[in-house]
Swiss-Prot record:
Disulfide bond residue pairs: none
HAMAP family: UPF0301 (MF_00758)
NCBIfam families: PRK00228.1-1
Recorded family membership: Belongs to the UPF0301 (AlgH) family.
PANTHER family xref list: UNCHARACTERIZED PROTEIN YQGE (PTHR30327), UPF0301 PROTEIN YQGE (PTHR30327:SF1)
Domain of life: Bacteria
GO CC terms, sorted: cytosol
Protein source organism: Shewanella baltica (strain OS195)
Protein name: UPF0301 protein Sbal195_3177
InterPro entries from the UniProt entry: AlgH-like
Length: 187
């Protein structure tokens, strides 16, 4: 299967998993060993500025950017105590991975300090936890019609409100996801 890195997984309406129902997941990595992604539309109930305050991070300049007050996302059920910042490409921080397509994933505290200062990435999304799949697990879920895929866009990642991301992603498919059957191969 071709890599789905830099794609979105869109939960099928028939997926009734309590965590992944109506989820949109940005796939950060996908190779023969498995896949890793971040749920981008499930808020944790805490804003980024509150998270910075809880971590006692100094803020040289409080950003007026909408993202500064954006919700921290529940990135997935794995390692929910671990933070991830998905952001537009900027100078590297301590633990940054270039994902291509002008995006980076950073897991170090220094990017959070930068978010509270004038060195913030232009656009960013903060998440706690991630979604992970072992070898061939995601491929099986795709074969089971749990997910639809589309290429990722920065607009959906950063410019659309979290509650509008699943409907927007579904519309980007070019059809109404609610009218797609979860059953494959039956007429």
């Amino acid at each position: 299967m071709e890599s789905l890195q830099n794609h979105f997984l869109i939960a099928m309406p028939s997926l009734h998993d309590t965590f992944f129902e109506r989820s949109v997941i940005y796939i950060c990595e996908h190779d023969a060993k498995g896949a890793m992604g971040l749920v981008i539309n499930k808020p944790l109930g805490i804003e980024v500025n509150s998270l910075l305050e809880q971590m006692d991070l100094p803020a040289e300049q409080v950003s007026t950017d909408l993202a500064f007050n954006a919700n921290v996302m529940m990135g997935g059920p794995v390692s929910q105590d671990r933070g991830f910042v998905l952001h537009t490409s900027q100078p590297y921080w301590a633990n940054s991975t270039d994902l291509g397509c002008g995006l980076m994933l950073t897991t170090s505290r220094d990017v959070l300090t930068a978010i509270g200062s004038n060195r913030s990435p232009e656009k960013f999304l903060v998440a706690l936890g991630y979604a992970g799949w072992s070898k061939d697990q995601l491929e099986q879920e795709l074969a089971d019609n749990s997910w639809l895929t589309i290429p990722a866009t920065n607009a959906l990642l950063f410019d659309i409100k979290h509650e509008d991301r699943w409907p927007q992603a579904s519309r980007a498919l070019g059809f109404d996801a609610w009218q797609v059957s979860a059953q494959a191969g039956h007429a």
